[in-house]
From Swiss-Prot:
Pfam families: HGTP_anticodon (PF03129), tRNA-synt_His (PF13393)
Locations listed in the record: Cytoplasm
Presence of keyword Transcription: no
Record GO cellular component, one term: cytoplasm
Family annotation (Gene3D superfamilies): Anticodon-binding domain, Bira Bifunctional Protein, Domain 2
Catalytic activity, EC: 6.1.1.21
Protein name per the record: Histidine--tRNA ligase
Gene: hisS
Subunit structure as annotated in this protein's UniProt entry: Homodimer.
InterPro entries: aa-tRNA-synth_II (IPR006195), aa-tRNA-synth_II/BPL/LPL (IPR045864), Anticodon-bd (IPR004154), Anticodon-bd_dom_sf (IPR036621), His-tRNA-ligase (IPR015807), HisRS-like_core (IPR041715), HisRS/HisZ (IPR004516), HisRS_anticodon (IPR033656)
Top-rank taxon, per record: Bacteria
Length: 414
């Protein structure tokens, strides 16, 4: 019996990888345009990192992490999200000593044990960005605009930006008390998870996908009505900067996010094209996370997007990489010339294919069609003798003659 992939872990096959490369390359362009640098961190971390950052009572830590004990009796976890590992590296390598302001981005796989569904898997991939060292709301607006710019870059203007503020440690306790008072008489209508959340993290009841909980929490107090003056001013400034740049957004007072480290600005990009699980990107400010992980008191803000979900939004677009040229030969005597041309053209950045097995000309041209090559050329004895050949544009059959020299062919293909 053949071995298959683990449930919820998918292979990205060649016909799909072009779509992923398109997404990743667009993200790199946007990030680097905004002054961000790439950081790469391990996919495994000490379990304590996620317990301290995400929160012991979060669904991720309690139910979804892939955690194991290694041969050295250390508790190790496959990363369920990217921010904690990036901040661990920021602290460990004392990046803050050089400059507290860091603008970092990352790409890579994450792991959560949850029920696989459309666009959501046990191994999934995220692209994320983090900014440290600045509390100014202008940075929040830049991060939000950068995220929206990415979706515009890949031709997706449908996802809409939703924002909220979760306040700070000064104003959140009063809101927590008000929310608990509201929920007290509705506990019997909450799901079992939310009954447990009521005492440990009541804000998470607002994020529950259960229809019963959504109904029970209708009319719940809003965090926006309980912000301290500093947080209210901060959120007003974020909105003002977004308005200044003409950014489209709406306020979602029920947005709380699933990670415990968020403070003040939180946000999601949502779409109606993926069913109930509508967020394709999300993030927020985490001003206490770095100190919580043992570093200095330095603020931060960031986001992550799910690559699988973004790929779904791109629909049926064709991202395959077509060869620029297919070189066919009439016989073994012309293969040396074809191979030399192939090598020289590839070294000049041209995508070229040829037959490797001495197949018939008919078979070679069928392969050129299958690969959807832009041009084809047939090298026979006459072409070899004259040093010239006709290059056929495959979409309409138009032929142009050129010398069998790399520079001439590059000019013709341009």
């Amino acid at each position: 019996m053949a071995i298959t992939a683990i449930k919820g872990c998918n292979d990205i096959l060649p016909e799909e990888s072009g779509r992923w490369q398109y997404i990743e390359q667009a993200a790199r362009r946007i990030f680097e345009r905004n002054g961000f640098s790439e950081i790469r961190v391990p996919i495994m971390e000490k379990t304590e990192l996620f317990c301290r950052s995400i929160g012991d009572t979060s669904d991720i830590v309690e139910k979804e992490m892939y955690t194991f004990t290694d041969k050295g009796e250390n508790s190790v976890t496959l990363r369920p999200e990217g921010t904690a590992g990036v901040m661990r590296a920021y602290i460990e390598h004392k990046m803050h000593a050089q400059d507290p302001l860091a603008k970092l981005y990352y790409l890579g796989p994450m792991f959560r044990y949850e029920r696989p569904q459309k666009g959501r898997y046990r191994q999934f991939h995220q692209i994320g960005a983090e900014v440290t060292g600045v509390t100014d709301p202008l940075v929040d607006a830049q991060v939000l605009n950068m995220l929206c710019a990415f979706f515009h870059e890949i031709g997706l203007d449908e996802p809409t930006l939703q924002i909220n503020s979760l306040g700070c440690p000064d104003c959140r306790p009063a809101y927590r008390a008000a929310l608990m008072e509201f929920l007290q008489g509705r506990l019997d209508r909450l799901c079992d998870d939310c009954k447990r959340r009521f005492t440990v993290n009541p804000l998470r009841t607002l994020d529950c996908k259960s229809a019963g909980c959504a109904e029970a929490t209708k009319g719940a107090p809003a965090m926006l009505d309980h912000l301290c003056t500093a947080c209210d001013d901060h959120f007003s400034s974020v909105k003002r900067y977004l308005d200044l740049t003409g950014s489209r957004y709406s306020i979602n007072p029920r947005m709380v996010r699933g990670l415990d480290y968020y403070t003040r600005t939180t946000f999601e990009l949502v779409t109606g094209l993926l069913g109930a699980q509508s967020a394709v990107a999300a993030g927020g400010r985490y001003d206490g996370l770095i100190s919580q992980l043992g570093g200095p008191s330095i603020p931060g803000i960031g986001f992550a997007m799910g690559v699988e979900r973004v790929a779904l939004l791109l629909g049926e677009r064709d991202f395959s990489r077509r060869p620029d040229l297919f070189i066919a030969t009439m016989g073994a005597g012309q293969r040396d010339k074809a191979f030399c041309l192939l090598t020289k053209l590839q070294n000049q950045g041209i995508r070229v294919e040829m037959d490797y097995e001495g197949k018939s000309l008919k078979s070679q041209m069928r392969r050129a069609d299958k690969l959807r090559a832009r041009f084809s050329v047939v090298i026979g004895e006459n072409e070899l003798a004259t040093g010239r050949a006709s290059f056929k544009r495959m979409e309409d059959g138009v032929q142009n003659e050129a010398a069998l020299e790399a520079d001439d062919i590059v000019t013709l293909l341009a």
